[in-house]
């Protein structure tokens, strides 16, 4: 039986960053003389160790749009604190009508995530996670909601510092 290739493409760069293209949209501008075609690309870039960035690019040709998106993703990378290849704690991210729930998982669970979320966790280096998305399935909104949730992630040390307690008291 033939295996269906996923829409997401990825590769490892010489600088150690992993790149994945999530979506390419063809857009049309109608002018008096006819139609002007263009392309919009959505990509994510990660280092496999908790850093992740999202980029959007627009151009008249697909490769140029993808390259612009990759460059923007590299510039906008943020660090997310991971714990043994999974998240620190359960977190919810929202953007527009998209809502995503992300929860840490035990070793051996794998990446249980759909669509654009899977690409994010693969380039980020997350190996065990359970996710659920609600509302909008638009790739742009899902990626933004996922990144919103990941930005809310905090380590036990950060929480302990905010509360004025020790890490042992926080972890119980």
UniProtKB/Swiss-Prot annotation:
It comes from the Bacteria. GO terms for cellular component: small ribosomal subunit. Pfam families: Ribosomal_S5, Ribosomal_S5_C. One of its GO terms (biological process) is translation. GO terms for molecular function: rRNA binding; structural constituent of ribosome. Keywords: Ribonucleoprotein, Ribosomal protein, RNA-binding, rRNA-binding. This is Small ribosomal subunit protein uS5. It comes from Ralstonia nicotianae (strain ATCC BAA-1114 / GMI1000). The gene is rpsE.
């Amino acid at each position: 039986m033939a295996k269906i290739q996923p829409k997401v493409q990825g590769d490892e760069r010489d600088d150690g960053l992993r790149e994945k293209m999530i979506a390419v949209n063809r857009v049309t501008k109608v002018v008096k003389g006819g139609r002007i075609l263009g392309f919009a690309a959505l990509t994510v870039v990660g280092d496999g160790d908790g850093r992740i960035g999202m980029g959007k690019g627009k151009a008249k040709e697909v490769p140029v749009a993808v390259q612009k998106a990759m460059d923007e993703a590299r510039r906008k990378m943020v660090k997310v604190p991971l714990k043994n290849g999974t998240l620190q704690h359960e977190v919810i991210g929202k953007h527009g009508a998209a809502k995503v729930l992300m929860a840490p998982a035990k070793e051996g669970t794998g990446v249980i995530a759909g669509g654009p979320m899977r690409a994010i966790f693969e380039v980020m280096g997350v190996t065990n996670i359970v996710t659920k998305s609600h509302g909008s399935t638009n790739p742009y909104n899902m990626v933004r909601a996922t990144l919103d949730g990941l930005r809310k992630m905090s380590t036990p040390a950060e929480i302990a510092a905010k509360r004025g307690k020790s890490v042992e008291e926080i972890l119980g």
